[in-house]
């Protein structure tokens, strides 16, 4: 291949990458991921994907929670960008389990922040947290397994997510560096004599 041919080929690849939305090209795996923003959760490695190469749309927030903005993003990718699978990843030792909601509310109020009638979106003034609603909005939680399972069911039943989309939830174990389904801890299955079938 001549240098000219190589450069033309490279250009075509760059053009295809830059214009993939205009050309109707979905992400490579037709995948949308919602994961916690925690740096200990290596989404690409955990799922065996290359986000930097276009394998998935990855949405990250505190806790990997299905919020209104997560629904907005999932709705767009599933209905308009060809996405056919959703994976939700929560993780052990998540900061969203590290404090009670009341503690968060008090800490912010102690900083002088008014949490009553808090506007969430300047373009949608209707999206305002009324007095006492901030705690529900911030979504601190107690149990990572319950939270993950509940989010999967919520997405499966959401009217903006097409019914054909495959949806699963997983827990990243920070302590082992592996994914597992909610409510299944391998360590509990192999580390007791009862689990091992002792008589």
Swiss-Prot record:
One of its GO terms (molecular function) is zinc ion binding. Zn(2+) binds at residues 36, 91, 94. GO terms for biological process: hydrogen sulfide biosynthetic process. It catalyses: carbon disulfide + 2 H2O = 2 hydrogen sulfide + CO2 + 2 H(+). InterPro entries: Carbonic_anhydrase, Carbonic_anhydrase_sf. Its cofactor is Zn(2+). Binds 1 zinc ion per subunit. Keywords: Hydrolase, Metal-binding, Zinc. Its EC number is 3.13.1.5. It is an enzyme of class 3 (hydrolase). Pathway: Sulfur metabolism; hydrogen sulfide biosynthesis. It holds the Pfam family Pro_CA. Catalyzes the conversion of carbon disulfide into hydrogen sulfide and carbon dioxide, with carbonyl sulfide as an intermediate. Likely plays a key role in sulfur metabolism that allows A.thiooxidans G8 to grow on carbon disulfide as the main carbon and energy source. Does not show carbonic anhydrase activity (hydration of CO(2) to carbonate). Belongs to the beta-class carbonic anhydrase family. Exists as both octamers and hexadecamers in solution. The hexadecameric homooligomer may form a catenane, through interactions of two interlocked octameric rings. This is Carbon disulfide hydrolase.
């Amino acid at each position: 291949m001549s240098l000219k041919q190589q450069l033309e080929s490279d250009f075509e690849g760059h053009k295809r990458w830059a214009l993939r939305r205009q050309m109707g090209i979905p992400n490579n795996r037709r995948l949308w991921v919602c994961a916690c923003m925690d740096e200990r959760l290596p989404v690409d490695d955990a799922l065996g994907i290359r986000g930097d190469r276009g394998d998935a749309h990855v949405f990250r927030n505190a806790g990997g929670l299905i919020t209104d903005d997560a629904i907005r993003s999932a709705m767009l990718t599933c209905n308009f960008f060809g996405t056919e699978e959703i994976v939700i990843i929560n993780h052990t030792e998540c900061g969203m389990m590290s404090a009670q909601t009341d503690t968060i509310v008090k800490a912010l109020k102690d900083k002088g922040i008014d949490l009553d009638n808090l506007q969430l979106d300047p373009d949608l003034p209707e999206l305002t947290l009324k007095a006492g609603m901030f705690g529900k909005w911030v979504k601190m939680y107690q149990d990572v397994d319950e939270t993950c399972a509940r989010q999967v069911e919520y997405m499966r039943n959401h009217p903006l997510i097409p019914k054909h989309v495959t949806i699963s939830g997983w827990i990243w174990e920070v302590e082992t560096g592996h994914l597992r389904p909610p409510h299944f801890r391998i360590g509990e299955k192999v580390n007791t004599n009862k689990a091992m079938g002792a008589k």
